[in-house]
Curated annotation (Swiss-Prot):
CDD domains registered for this protein in UniProt: ExoVII_LU_OBF (cd04489)
Gene Ontology cellular component annotations, sorted alphabetically: cytoplasm; exodeoxyribonuclease VII complex
EC number: 3.1.11.6
Protein role: Bidirectionally degrades single-stranded DNA into large acid-insoluble oligonucleotides, which are then degraded further into small acid-soluble oligonucleotides.
Principal localisation: cytoplasm
UniProt record similarity statement: Belongs to the XseA family.
GO biological process, one term: DNA catabolic process
Name of the featured protein: Exodeoxyribonuclease 7 large subunit
Catalysis: reaction(s): Exonucleolytic cleavage in either 5'- to 3'- or 3'- to 5'-direction to yield nucleoside 5'-phosphates
Lineage of origin: Bacteria, Pseudomonadati, Pseudomonadota, Gammaproteobacteria, Enterobacterales
Amino acid sequence: MSQPPGTNIFTVSRLNSTVRKLLEMEMGQVWLSAEISNFSQPSSGHWYFTLKDDTAQVRCAMFRNGNRRVTFRPQNGQQVLVRATITLYEPRGDYQLIAESMQPAGDGLLQQQFDQLKQRLMAEGLFEQAHKQPLPDPARQVGVITSSSGAALHDVLRVLQRRDPSLPVVIYPTPVQGAEAPTGIVRAIELANARKECDVLIVGRGGGSLEDLWSFNDERVARAIFASRIPIVSAVGHETDVTIADFVADLRAPTPSAAAELVSRDQIERLRQLQQQQQRMEMAMDYYLARQQSTFTRLQHRLQQQHPQLRLARQQTALMKVQRRLDDALQQHLRQATRRQEQLGQRLNAFRPEMRIERASQQLQQWQYRLRQAMQQRLGTGKQHFGQLAARLEGVSPLATLARGFSVTSTAEGQVVKKTGQLHQGDTLKTRLDDGWIESEVTAITPLKKTRRRST
């Protein structure tokens, strides 16, 4: 076995320190695109997590002073871009990263930018309902701001042709995707406002990914929509797609086809409204003629009412009514007098002495019966209580104790003897038994010795 050279023998501490310095000097800072897992934040405020891809992972730490500058809260499973320094934790020999900055990657970055712009514009009041302009009803001419080759334009024109072929349409072609798209959309909105050809604008495009729709999340486009003096309907993507333009626009349509529905009037609906107006005019004319006919009939009736024979007939009818009312009044008075007489007779019978005496006698008998019952009940209760007290008194009586074989001894002076220390030899004692008294003389006194209990 060969002997190791004396100058190249490493301790574990020295080896880990050397490897750490090599990693830090050779690698320096690196950028990583990875997925976060095992994220934790203890009370110290530092972040500890793992960065991984499909086949590998590495531990990572981000100290409190660095993570304060991160504008989002990392979540497990989130894709991020991390700038970090490679190092080695010497006590355990674990290779790890110290993150210095972090930002979302891919759609996560776009979503963060979307949320930040949304909050800023909301704080400025660009989304408030008070700034929304009403759509014209009906629209005289519609402007469409979209790509001239996209499916959105085809959908809008198809719906407008079906619903209202007579409605004029002005197309303001512009790119809706790519770096130049926001500038083109803003220029088209400003051109439509300058020409004043249309009284409503549709701004939008077909569906796509978040990156495809990003032109409508541009701040320049949002401010151009807000500044437009012509009402704007946003129609970007599908119903689930939401952009900044949707929040700023005067009205949001879920699709370009739906936007065309909102700004146009259906021919069939217009025909139905025309028919309803015609029906209302006919009903108004019928009502006017009916009122005139009613007025004529009323005047004719009033003229007929002034005929002398008709007036005489009315007087005779009134006389018959008065006579009938007089007969009814006499009959009513007679019925009331008869009913009054019957009531007085009933009251007189009620005050007869015999009936009052009979009722008083019955009541007296009831009281006597109730008094006897109460006395018997009270006497029984008293006897029972007396028996209970006598039994209790008997239980504590000294005489009862004597009957069980006990006796009570007292001195000649009548003092009850309880201990031997009260007596002297030659004293006379009196002892009470159950059936009498005996007298005796003390001839000897023998106190009992107290026994001590052993402690266990």
